[in-house]
């Protein structure tokens, strides 16, 4: 049976005809007011998460204001294009569900590490960014290949392995969040890092996020990040803490996307860590698409479900390739949008097309990314600390899908020790061969490889 025969195509609320928690199903076309309302909820739930990875990477690498503005704009634009590809489902590409795409946090740590190494080696901004985006294009093929052999990949990258890697990603990112809370790298250079006003501003944002997430009103919970950051921005203005930049910014009304704006290069030492993160991202995508299928009241088993999984993972890899071509960072499915589907009762993928169009339009206006750049570092840090802690906690949740017996505890302990140890004391590899140094220089790669190897050589314990 085709998808169209399984789903209603009229715009009548399904609750009127069957026992369902949904108001509009996958192929329904809600009236314009309901469509716009649901689309705005999706945008509020994801907007901060789309722009933050690009902002963190650009700030950590010390990119000029104009380059940062360009990359943030392209993050919004690419997320919109990627969402259309994921939702539309052309042939084998795409899940065909209301799966909104956005910039992935998983790549923040390895890209900052790789970019810093290139910068230390004397690379200028165009050379550094060309190498990062070129390596991302090559590494994204990993996810496309995995989409064709999902059954094999899931045997090697078990919940234990992927959970450990996600934990390392989250724990590595907490340092980035704390750096922003203290005032960022600029504050380090002028000896104002950790100033009481920075900690106060970040603390207010953090407290607001916690407070809003404890409210019974679901709309406040969905918009908690946006509300808290807006309040933090207003408080920063009142305290005279808005950043002042004398660097020139794009004055054009419309920003025309330029493929390969920085050129094309490859940084081979960064390839393996990025490939490993793409492997983990592919499994996260499986979980996100399964959750989307579930809240959309679609099958979570059988041929249609498997087709959507393969199409979704393939689209994820393709979208990350497209994102790199348009000079921004990898895309992945956003799990928070599943909460919006439950909140609104609208699973119609036509709402997703409206969200995608909103993202594209926002990305074409440089004024949006220009405003984002003026968010004070402590405001960003207060918000991202919650996000990064959540990533680490989600790794714990993934690991807990398997029995935490002696074997599992040993694998987790050794993998975390190796991954975090290499990150915290990189000189441990100073006498290692160059190939091994490149292989294990990333804590994510070191911990992930350790988890994969131990998972394969330690036989599972009998229950």
Curated annotation (Swiss-Prot):
The chain crosses the membrane at residues 43-63, 71-91, 93-113, 126-146, 156-176, 192-212, 222-242, 260-280, 352-372, 379-399, 409-429, 439-459. Inhibited by CCCP and N-ethylmaleimide. GO terms for molecular function: xanthine transmembrane transporter activity. The keyword Transferase does not apply. Keywords: Cell inner membrane, Cell membrane, Membrane, Transmembrane, Transmembrane helix, Transport. It is a multi-pass membrane protein. GO terms for biological process: xanthine transport. It catalyses: xanthine(in) + H(+)(in) = xanthine(out) + H(+)(out). Disulfide bonds: none annotated. It is found in: Cell inner membrane. Pfam families: Xan_ur_permease. GO terms for cellular component: plasma membrane. Specific, proton motive force-dependent high-affinity transporter for xanthine. Belongs to the nucleobase:cation symporter-2 (NCS2) (TC 2.A.40) family. This is Xanthine permease XanP. It comes from Escherichia coli (strain K12). The lineage of its organism: Bacteria, Pseudomonadati, Pseudomonadota, Gammaproteobacteria, Enterobacterales. The gene is xanP.
């Amino acid at each position: 049976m085709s998808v169209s025969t399984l789903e209603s195509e009229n715009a009548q609320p399904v609750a009127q005809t069957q026992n369902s928690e949904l108001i509009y199903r996958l192929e329904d076309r809600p009236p314009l007011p309901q469509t716009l309302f649901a689309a705005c909820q999706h945008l509020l739930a994801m907007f901060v998460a789309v722009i933050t990875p690009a902002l963190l990477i650009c700030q950590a690498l010390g990119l000029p204001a104009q380059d940062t503005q360009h990359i943030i704009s392209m993050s919004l634009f690419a997320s919109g294009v990627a969402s259309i590809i994921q939702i539309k489902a052309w042939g084998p590409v795409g899940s065909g569900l209301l799966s909104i795409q956005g910039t992935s946090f998983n790549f923040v740590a390895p890209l900052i590490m790789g970019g810093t190494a290139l910068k230390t080696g004397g690379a200028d901004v165009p050379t550094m960014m060309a190498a990062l985006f070129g390596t991302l294009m090559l590494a994204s093929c990993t996810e496309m290949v995995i989409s064709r052999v999902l059954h094999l990949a899931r045997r090697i990258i078990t919940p234990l392995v992927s959970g450990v890697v996600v934990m390392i990603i989250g724990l590595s990112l907490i340092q980035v969040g704390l750096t922003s809370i203290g005032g960022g790298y600029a504050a380090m250079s002028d000896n104002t890092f950790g100033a009481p006003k920075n900690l106060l501003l970040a603390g207010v944002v953090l407290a607001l996020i916690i407070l809003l997430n404890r409210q019974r009103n679901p709309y406040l919970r969905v918009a908690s990040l946006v509300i808290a950051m807006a309040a933090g921005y207003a408080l920063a203005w009142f305290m005279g803490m808005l950043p002042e930049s004398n660097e020139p910014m794009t004055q054009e009304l419309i920003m025309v996307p330029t493929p390969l704006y920085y050129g094309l290069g490859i940084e081979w030492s960064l390839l393996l860590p990025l490939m490993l993160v793409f492997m983990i991202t592919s499994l996260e995508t499986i979980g996100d698409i399964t959750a989307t299928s579930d809240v959309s009241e679609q099958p979570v088993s059988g041929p249609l479900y498997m087709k959507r999984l393969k199409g979704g993972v393939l689209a994820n890899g393709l979208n990350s390739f497209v994102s790199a071509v348009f000079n921004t960072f990898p895309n992945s499915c956003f799990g928070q949008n599943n909460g919006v589907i439950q909140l609104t009762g609208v699973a119609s993928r036509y709402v997703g097309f409206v969200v995608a169009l909103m993202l594209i339009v926002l990305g074409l206006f440089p004024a949006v990314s220009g405003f984002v750049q003026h968010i004070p570092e402590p405001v960003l840090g207060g918000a991202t600390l919650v996000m990064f802690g959540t990533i680490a906690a989600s790794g714990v949740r993934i690991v807990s899908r398997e029995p935490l017996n002696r074997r599992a505890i040993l694998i987790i302990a050794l993998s975390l020790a190796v991954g975090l140890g290499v990150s915290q004391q990189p000189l441990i590899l100073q006498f290692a061969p160059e190939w091994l140094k490149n292989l294990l220089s990333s804590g994510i790669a070191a911990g992930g490889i350790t988890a994969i190897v131990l998972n394969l050589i330690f036989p599972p314990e009998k229950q």
